[in-house]
């Protein structure tokens, strides 16, 4: 099976690095899927989007991201997000409460996290 090296990094931490069979991300140009040997590209991630990674040896990983960039070369995908959180790390009650916050950063992070949770529950 063909594979591609993937790194998902936020301002706060490295979320994941490893080999994957496909990566999808929501960019300002639309949702894209990246397979091994993809043509090089640079894309801007949408605010409050979702990134999915299918590792070669495990279950699909789903993260909510807010802003940043996606860089693709023949051998590697690098996702540099302003904020990123795994769907399974999101406290949905707290995130839903943050949707009503006056703090725009907290609201954006809540939206990104809840989108990841929804995508995860859809099984896509």
UniProtKB/Swiss-Prot annotation:
It comes from the Bacteria. One of its GO terms (molecular function) is proton-transporting ATP synthase activity, rotational mechanism. It is a peripheral membrane protein. InterPro entries: ATP_synth_F1_dsu/esu, ATP_synth_F1_dsu/esu_N, ATPsynth_dsu/esu_N. It is found in: Cell membrane. Its main location: membrane. Gene3D superfamilies: F0F1 ATP synthase delta/epsilon subunit, N-terminal. Pfam families: ATP-synt_DE_N. CDD domains: F1-ATPase_delta (cd12152). Keywords: ATP synthesis, Cell membrane, CF(1), Hydrogen ion transport, Ion transport, Membrane, Transport. GO terms for cellular component: plasma membrane; proton-transporting ATP synthase complex. F-type ATPases have 2 components, CF(1) - the catalytic core - and CF(0) - the membrane proton channel. CF(1) has five subunits: alpha(3), beta(3), gamma(1), delta(1), epsilon(1). CF(0) has three main subunits: a, b and c. Belongs to the ATPase epsilon chain family. Produces ATP from ADP in the presence of a proton gradient across the membrane. This is ATP synthase epsilon chain. It comes from Corynebacterium glutamicum (strain R).
């Amino acid at each position: 099976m063909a594979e591609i090296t993937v790194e998902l990094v936020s301002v706060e931490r490295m979320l994941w690095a490893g080999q994957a069979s496909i990566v999808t991300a929501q960019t300002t140009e639309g949702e894209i899927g990246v397979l091994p040997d993809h043509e090089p590209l640079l894309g801007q991630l949408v605010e409050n989007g979702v990134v999915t990674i299918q590792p070669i040896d495990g279950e699909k990983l789903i993260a909510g991201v807010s802003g940043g960039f996606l860089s693709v070369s023949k051998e590697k995908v690098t996702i540099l997000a302003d904020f990123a959180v795994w769907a399974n790390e999101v406290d949905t009650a707290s995130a839903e409460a943050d949707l009503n916050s006056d703090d725009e950063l907290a609201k954006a992070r809540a939206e990104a996290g809840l989108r990841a949770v929804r995508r995860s529950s859809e099984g896509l």
